Amino acid sequence: MFDVIIIGAGVCGASIARRLSRYKLDILILEKENDVSMGASKANSAIVHGGYAESGKELRGRICYPGRKSFEKLNEELNFGFLANGSLVLAFDEEDMKTLDKLYQMGLENGLDDMEIIDQEKLRSIEKNVSDDAIGALYCKGAGVCSPYEYVIALVENALDNGVKLELNSEVVDIEKSNDTFKVETSKGETYESKFVINASGLNGAKVSSMITETDFDIHPRSGEYLIMQKGTGSRIKQVLFQTPSPKSKGILVTRTYHNNILIGPDAIDEEEIDLGTHEERLMEIYKLAQKSVKDDVLNLKEFIRSFTGLRPASSTGDFIIENSQTNGFINVVGIQSPGVTSSPEIARMVEGILVDLGINLTEDETYNPYRKPIIEYKELEDFNKVKDLVDLPLGNPDRLVCRCEQVSEKTIRDALNRGIELTSFDAVKRRTRAGMGFCQGAFCKNRVLEVMEDEYGHPIENRKFDSEGSGLSRINKKDINEIIKKMSK
């Protein structure tokens, strides 16, 4: 019997698990995929938002800024990668300036004290590569970027260190309640019992909710496509650059990532079905719109390395849904689209409060450890001529460079393999170490990573493909972009 079962190991489920792991509770996370952070938490803009883009009349508007204020301390404890580099919402005409004033007023209502509307002169002084057409901006000093999948991984690793249990490849197929006890059945045929159940299942939120309680909301996928440029390009931009938002999104952004790539996107398309593919027409429209924000020499399609699609779990209510359901003790945490990553610490606090109201006994665990060592130590890449001899070192040498593009050592990979979650794919290692995230996108290092995995675990790795291989996904890649460049040059 568990005290709490959490369905979903995305940013909400992970944040809640880590928050509750400080108490003497038996907690289980059930995740349907083969790793944590496999849904919206993996594929998004990676922004720690300011807290001005949503009205305080909405729950997501009220909890974004308190969530954002938690990130510096969280990163000090968990070492997942957070940089408070600031954000700029750009204005290109007087209508845009009116929009900035509305955003500023919403920010004030939400309690922000680190934003201002700046003129063209100050804008140029803090962001030299911003477009000459920008006439002003809303500047939020405390906004920033993080590595969202590393954030979720860190939360789960720390929760596991503090006694939480995790079951992967365990999709919830049925939930029943009898005599104040929930019975949760998974696709593995296992049944787990608990006093409380938290539904943090992302796009499956309405489906899971309807298994046990009356559900008056829908969750539908809203897709957004992105382009990523090679490492090092991010140094051309200091802040996160937004254009003025639409009703569906915060506008096309150009930003550096925590690991110093340029990230461009997303658009926002409501989908009938899940589609994680990327499309030439959409990506080229995103690229064209992004060029509006920066000087001509900032973006270069020849530096493109990858495209991806994120699916936001948009609710029919238009807002976050965080509440005890009509089936007492079954708590919905669904419809968590943007700014979900930023709000996640506050979401976890809210769920703790709901559990307290429902009568859970929270006793502090004196052995609780909030700290987690980093897997990746942030560093600039060395000149390859200085490190090329490390590539040829034999298997078993901790200094051997397994990935040459990102210069990932064997000791880093072995560290990632021993963090409480057995990794079963190359991509799982990639998300933790950046092996395969460089210019060649794993062409050189995939088999080398799998070799280390097999040596460390002592058994063959059955899944030897990239996550996207064999899944039917069609994504625009470097070869496709090169063909587009050729067409553009004619």
Predicted regions and their residues:
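N-terminal Rossmann-like FAD-binding beta1-loop-alpha1 element of flavoenzymes
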Residues: 2-29
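Helical element adjacent to the flavin cofactor pocket in flavoenzyme catalytic cores
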Residues: 138-196
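Short beta-strand to alpha-helix junction loop
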Residues: 55, 60-65, 90-99, 138-157, ...
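C-terminal catalytic lobe of FAD-dependent flavoproteins
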Residues: 249, 258-259, 274-401, 408-412, ...
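Flavin-dependent oxidoreductases
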Residues: 15, 175-180, 186-265, 269-279, ...
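Dinucleotide-binding Rossmann-like beta1-alpha1 core, especially the glycine-rich loop
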Residues: 46-126, 251-252
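Glycine-rich phosphate/pyrophosphate-binding beta-alpha loops
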Residues: 53, 143-145, 249, 330-343, ...
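Glycine-rich FAD pyrophosphate-binding loop
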Residues: 22-43
